[in-house]
């Protein structure tokens, strides 16, 4: 909630040692659930995200120490659409629509985290512009 420019609400479903599961509601009302499948202390985590009964995408967050006061964060997304049907048929829609929207979204999320860290206050909603999937 504090750094995500498109997140309206984030609720914990279950947060025990071996079971991390939460729900995100975006500004446009879209609700997704995240099931964390691996948690690597001081390195990052992997999760599956999607609507409650819908298709799931796989996401990996990784943190790398650069120096004492600097880290690098990477987010790798494997959208569910890439694993559906013919790769040849999916190639053009993915390249023309999904990939640019995904890059824009991730740039805003990372920008929100940077903004929050530098300003020590919540990132304003849609701070980096609206997003057609989540605003």
Regions found by a protein language model. Name each.
Residues 1-18, 134-135:
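Hydrophobic ligand-binding cavity/cleft-lining segments
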Residues 16-18, 41, 67:
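Residue-level recognition of beta-strand termini and adjacent short loop/turns
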Residues 20-27, 46-52:
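Short beta-strand segments that buttress and anchor functional surface loops
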Residues 23, 33, 44-46, 60-62, ...:
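Beta-strand secondary-structure signal
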Residues 27-31, 55-57:
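Short coil-to-beta-strand transition motifs
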Residues 51-108, 113-115, 119, 124-126:
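Beta-strand/loop substructures that line and gate deep hydrophobic ligand-binding cavities in soluble
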Residues 123-135:
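Charge-rich (especially acidic), low-complexity segments
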């Amino acid at each position: 909630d504090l750094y995500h420019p498109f997140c309206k609400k984030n609720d914990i479903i279950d947060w025990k040692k071996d079971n991390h599961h939460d729900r995100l509601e975006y500004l446009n009302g879209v609700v997704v659930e995240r099931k964390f499948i691996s948690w690597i202390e001081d390195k990052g985590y992997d999760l599956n995200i999607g609507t409650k009964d819908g298709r799931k995408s796989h996401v990996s967050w990784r943190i790398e120490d650069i120096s004492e006061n600097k880290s690098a964060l990477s987010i790798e997304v494997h959208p569910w659409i890439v694993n559906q049907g013919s790769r040849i048929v999916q190639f053009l829609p993915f390249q023309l629509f999904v990939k640019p929207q995904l890059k824009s979204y991730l740039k805003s999320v990372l920008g929100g985290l940077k903004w929050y860290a530098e300003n020590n206050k919540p990132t304003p909603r849609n701070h980096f512009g609206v997003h057609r999937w989540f605003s």
